[in-house]
A protein has these predicted regions:
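Signal peptide-proximal N-terminal region
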Residues: 49, 70-92, 182-187, 214-218
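Bacterial N-terminal signal peptides that target proteins for export
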Residues: 1-10
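Extracytoplasmic ligand/sensor domains, especially the bilobed periplasmic-binding protein
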Residues: 117-223, 273-298
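Extracellular/periplasmic periplasmic-binding protein-like sensory domains
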Residues: 166, 262-337, 349, 403-419
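C-terminal motif of bacterial Sec signal peptides marking the signal peptidase cleavage site
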Residues: 18-22
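Segments of small-molecule ligand-sensing domains
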Residues: 323-333, 344-400
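Extracytoplasmic "Venus flytrap"
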Residues: 38-73, 95-102, 124-125, 195-204, ...
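Beta-alpha junction/loop-to-helix N-cap segments that form part of ligand/metal-binding clefts
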Residues: 27-31, 35-40, 63-68, 83-155, ...
């Protein structure tokens, strides 16, 4: 759910994507499973099915890009160990888009026109997926992407685009908003402050929270958009402290913004009753080390994936990931694996890779069970579910909502004081 920065180059990139040269099953109701495992014990044979993707393996966004690569490659390995896709081995061709919009457009054009891939998987972030998905749409190829929840992804009338997480950016914090709205009057915040990144993903998260909390009766006392190059949040923290809001919500796209705002709030000595941050707290130890372990307690954030989630295939995925990489999967790795599961489910249901429209039509009409849970999509390719609501508690990351997925019965409220 960590998404990247908006650049002014996007109109040019979209123009390049949309002028690129074009290349050249029955629906079934119910939930299909993209398991990462085909017909167990069956040897894949024949010409490989080539799946193309470009990821930010270098540049500013290399950390989530490398994690996504791990997810894709684990899925490929498991599929090939268990009979392949439609009985054929899978070959994933991954290019490095260098965290650059122009490069990602060139990469997907090359994958389609030169590498002659049969299928596509998406890149990381709304920033890169907006132009990349335009290349896929122009070429009438299914485009399942693991990390691009900006509203701008879904307002273009695309038929082949699908986002393989639970919800789009404006709805990332729906469970937080619902929880706040349901608090007793003596616990419910009266005033709110919103720190909004100028970013196609992070901005809509904070704006969605503000809209929801205002509808719940929370008065807005501070709401400002900050530029993506902001490093020092001291002035923002001081302005917020002067307004004394009960709840603070930040919408950003990565680790650094959230860490720096928290440090500044600690510095000015202002502690809200409730504190929600998009993206940053999900960076686990990097967030904890950045803000200080004692300053994580009570911080809310949204998650697409948690290692302890009781979702279909998650236990097997977790074990396989640890065995292959000797580490727990990052959220971005799980998101990429789930995107591949969605692609697999469509191909297996249709029984062919020759009709991309049939694959898209099947996904529009059906649900798919993944390690993130059951996913379904509206006519724009936007998902229709809800993210998990998580909270840092005593140095641990806990799922607090929904109740049937919670790893604890406790929600820390109000937030404990900062530890200087």
């Amino acid at each position: 759910m960590r998404r990247l920065l908006w650049l002014l180059a996007l109109p040019l990139v979209l123009a390049l994507a949309l002028t690129a040269a074009a290349c050249g099953g029955d629906d079934e109701e119910g939930a299909a499973t993209g398991t990462g495992t085909g017909a167990t014990g069956t040897q894949a044979s024949g010409e490989p099915i080539k799946i193309g993707a470009s990821l930010p393996l270098t540049g500013d966004f290399s950390e989530p890009g490398v994690a996504a690569k791990q997810g894709y490659e684990l899925w490929q390995e498991q599929v090939n160990q268990n009979g392949g896709l439609l009985g054929r081995p899978v070959e994933i061709v991954i290019k490095d888009d260098q965290s650059d919009q122009n490069v990602v457009v060139a990469d997907y054009n090359a994958l389609i026109q030169q590498d002659k891939v049969d299928l596509l998987l998406g890149t990381f972030s709304s920033l890169l997926n907006i132009p990349a998905s335009a290349v896929a749409e122009r070429n009438q190829m299914l485009y399942v992407e693991p990390a691009g929840g900006s509203p701008e992804m879904f307002n273009r009338g695309f038929q082949y685009l699908f986002f393989a997480q639970q919800a789009t950016a404006p709805h990332q914090a729906d469970l937080f908003v619902e929880w706040v709205g349901g608090l007793p009057d003596d616990e419910k915040p009266k005033t709110g402050a919103y720190v909004i990144a100028d970013d196609p993903f992070g901005g809509p998260v904070a704006e969605g929270i503000q809209k929801g909390l205002e509808a719940a009766g929370v008065q807005t006392v501070y709401s400002e958009v900050y530029p993506p190059e902001t490093k020092n949040f001291d002035a923002i923290a001081s302005a917020i402290a002067a307004k004394k809001p009960d709840v603070i919500a930040q919408g950003s796209a990565g680790l650094e913004d959230g860490v720096n705002l928290t440090r500044s709030l600690v510095k000015v000595g202002y502690n809200p009753k409730q504190y929600f941050q998009a993206s940053s707290p999900s960076f686990a130890d990097q967030y904890s080390n950045g803000v200080g372990a004692g300053n994580t307690d009570g911080v809310f954030y949204a998650l697409s994936y948690h290692p302890e989630a009781e979702t279909p295939g998650n236990t097997e995925f977790l074990e396989a990931f640890k065995a292959k990489y000797d580490a727990e999967p990052a959220e971005d790795a799980a998101d990429a694996y789930a995107a591949a599961q969605v692609l697999q489910a469509a191909v297996e249901a249709v029984g062919s890779i020759d009709d991309q429209k049939a694959l898209a039509d099947w996904l529009h009409a059906n649900e798919v069970e993944t390690i993130l849970g059951t996913l379904s999509w509206d006519e724009t390719g936007a998902p229709e579910q809800a993210f998990l609501l998580a909270q840092w508690q005593n140095g641990n990351e806990e799922i607090v909502l929904p109740e049937d997925a919670a790893t604890t019965d406790t929600i820390v409220n109000p937030k404990p004081d900062w530890q200087q």
